[in-house]
Amino acid sequence: MSRFETQFATLNAKNEGAFVPFVTLCDPTFDRSFEIICTLVDNGADALELGFPFSDPLLDGPVIQAANNRALTAGHSSEDSFKLLEKVRSKYPEIPISLLLCANLIFAKGLDAFYQRCAEVGVDAVLVADIPLLAKEDYVQAAKKHGIQPVFICPPNADEKTIQGVAENSEGYTYLVSRAGVTSAENQAHAANLDTLVEQLKAHNAPPILQGFGIAQPEQVKEALSLGTAGAISGSATVKIIERNLDNHEQCLAELAEFVQTMKAATK
């Protein structure tokens, strides 16, 4: 069983959902980022979704764009992100790790080389945010060759064919987007049809569904679980804590610890 499958089985046995924070690797620096990720895991994160710094992200709202810029301004490359992943994996051999990134980052390294490097540093799954199902073939092939689970996004406007494609091609987990638009902790609206989407994904035997976009409060974690999802992903709200504490790293870690504990408590 993969780390994601093992974790979901463990959570199911305890009747808990998953809380999965997202941060950008190397934001604001390599060393601080490592401490931030350790704080997330040590305070109850069930898995990690991590981004590579990139100058032109499509789905990212202003908070995560700023995180990308901080890491890039600090001079961090994709290889630094891989080294950071390696460090995280050696400290936490069991935690499921997924990458959420844009296709250009993968192209820059070459498909095969990118997924090979992911495997070397202990990444479990990769979600390429801007690759539609129609163009998935090469990515899925390269991922599977290196034992990496491909993950796909189910948008709120998905038709039956898309839902089936997402369900059949995703491994590890399925990413259900709460609403159209870019990531944001402020925009906490979600599409009205999410419960139907969850039902349809399950009917096609999709892997466990994690809901993301606009998850900033414990109530939203509970709401996501009540729809039948396996958990919730919180990116902008997590990264905002980093952003507002750039001058006080200890305060940043303390606030992140409290945030993760509160969000995790909502899954029980």
UniProtKB/Swiss-Prot annotation:
InterPro entries: Aldolase_TIM, RibuloseP-bd_barrel, Trp_synthase_alpha_AS, Trp_synthase_suA. GO terms for molecular function: tryptophan synthase activity. The alpha subunit is responsible for the aldol cleavage of indoleglycerol phosphate to indole and glyceraldehyde 3-phosphate. Belongs to the TrpA family. Pfam families: Trp_syntA. It comes from the Bacteria. Keywords: Amino-acid biosynthesis, Aromatic amino acid biosynthesis, Lyase, Tryptophan biosynthesis. It comes from Haemophilus influenzae (strain PittGG). Tetramer of two alpha and two beta chains. The gene is trpA. This is Tryptophan synthase alpha chain. Pathway: Amino-acid biosynthesis; L-tryptophan biosynthesis; L-tryptophan from chorismate: step 5/5. GO terms for cellular component: cytosol. Its EC number is 4.2.1.20. It catalyses: (1S,2R)-1-C-(indol-3-yl)glycerol 3-phosphate + L-serine = D-glyceraldehyde 3-phosphate + L-tryptophan + H2O. The active site is at residues 49, 60.
